[in-house]
């Protein structure tokens, strides 16, 4: 019997089973123990293959692919700490709902806890963060192929959102020519190999029922809070709220067009909060809210009912309101709960939103971080997409900009870390093949710098704007100790990104005014290549501008 040949047949069943559940993208890191999985993926024509030398970046690349494709994405890595590097992406997927299938090669049981090289305790290493876990046995013909394929099918049928970790031990030898070993074992699956359906099909219904009293609540004074959702859902939510006459507070990731812009500014005004207190019901569609003032209002508002609708299961209301948690796709829920045409009941909030917007517009000519956030909609590529980083930049865009309704916006706002942002943006671009604008801070770019390797070959123009404010300036918004702030919080690195771009043969610009930025962008959108644009700004100007605007709007 050839161990290497049977390893490959075992792996081929696993990979083929994944295709029956919509997996098309497979992300592969180099490794020896993962050879059976890698070769099975490489030989399966149903897959689009992506490779990267860094497993942490690979996991985030898969995350970006899953965000856009809305399908599960497989990741193949070798044993040892390679597996541990998938942890950040796995955690993010668990919080934002993207489906990742993590195929982690492992040493066989007899090599664990005995001093063998590159052998760690992988089974269960991700604790409660995967939505599903599956620890497979060592490949053996004593276990029928139908057990293996039905086990994979069952795990994927149970995967509503988040990650499935499949740990796959393989014994040596890992290399060798294919022979007839295990061929009969494999052929017992019959015409399944020519079919396109899972071996085991399980129906799982998660959608909430229609709320029978909706006809009553839609006649009340309501507020719509829009969190993370798709572009198509964002447009529908905006129209739904407008018909109801309810104010819509749209997050930067809502893609609703934010009809009441600068919510993070006007929610700091007591008049707005007083008017919102009249709401009898709040309907929150989508999770992962960004704005600090929005979260503060959400934590203190006390409507008669607070409904949260999202496709992800679990509790998504950190303020623990009395109300309803409804699991459903947002578009489906809106269809089941149509709006009734009513006059808007809010008067003060639209006025405050307009005044706040005027205050922001008055400062747009200054070359700076806050002004870039406000102007970002002017720089979006036609029929393209936006990827927004974390920390200060996403808060500035949320507070100061008004993105077009239905324009695709992506971000990692689950755990909201700054790790893997460039890799995620690369996955977003690869899955869509659209022109992409990504904007991150300097520390975020440094954190994921080797992801520039993923941006060397792109299918459409990709612009990466690095806002270099020399450190983690979000801490300037927090009451961190002044004497300790620079060394222990901001951590300025005093670097520029021209050499990093050159290392990966990427185009690079460092504009010093809006005209130079617009010229660089105009050239970038004409070529299917990556352009790095570094905006060097005064360290604390972005945070200070936001604080000044908050103070101004609070006194309107």
Swiss-Prot record:
Superkingdom of origin: Bacteria
Cofactor note: Binds 1 thiamine pyrophosphate per subunit.
Gene Ontology biological process terms in this record: menaquinone biosynthetic process
SUPFAM superfamilies: Thiamin diphosphate-binding fold (THDP-binding)
Required co-factors: Mg(2+); Mn(2+); thiamine diphosphate
Biological pathway: Quinol/quinone metabolism; 1,4-dihydroxy-2-naphthoate biosynthesis; 1,4-dihydroxy-2-naphthoate from chorismate: step 2/7; Quinol/quinone metabolism; menaquinone biosynthesis
EC number: 2.2.1.9
GO molecular function, one term: 2-succinyl-5-enolpyruvyl-6-hydroxy-3-cyclohexene-1-carboxylic-acid synthase activity
CDD domains: TPP_PYR_MenD, TPP_SHCHC_synthase
Record carries keyword DNA-binding: no
Keywords of this entry: Magnesium, Manganese, Menaquinone biosynthesis, Metal-binding, Thiamine pyrophosphate, Transferase
InterPro entries to which the protein is assigned, alphabetical: MenaQ_synth_MenD, MenD_middle, THDP-binding, Thiamin_PyroP_enz_TPP-bd_dom, TPP_enzyme_TPP-bd
Catalytic activity: isochorismate + 2-oxoglutarate + H(+) = 5-enolpyruvoyl-6-hydroxy-2-succinyl-cyclohex-3-ene-1-carboxylate + CO2
Pfam families: TPP_enzyme_C, TPP_enzyme_M_2, TPP_enzyme_N
EC top class named in words: transferase
Family classification: Belongs to the TPP enzyme family. MenD subfamily.
Assembly description: Homodimer.
Functional description taken from the UniProt entry: Catalyzes the thiamine diphosphate-dependent decarboxylation of 2-oxoglutarate and the subsequent addition of the resulting succinic semialdehyde-thiamine pyrophosphate anion to isochorismate to yield 2-succinyl-5-enolpyruvyl-6-hydroxy-3-cyclohexene-1-carboxylate (SEPHCHC).
Protein name: 2-succinyl-5-enolpyruvyl-6-hydroxy-3-cyclohexene-1-carboxylate synthase
Organism: Salmonella dublin (strain CT_02021853)
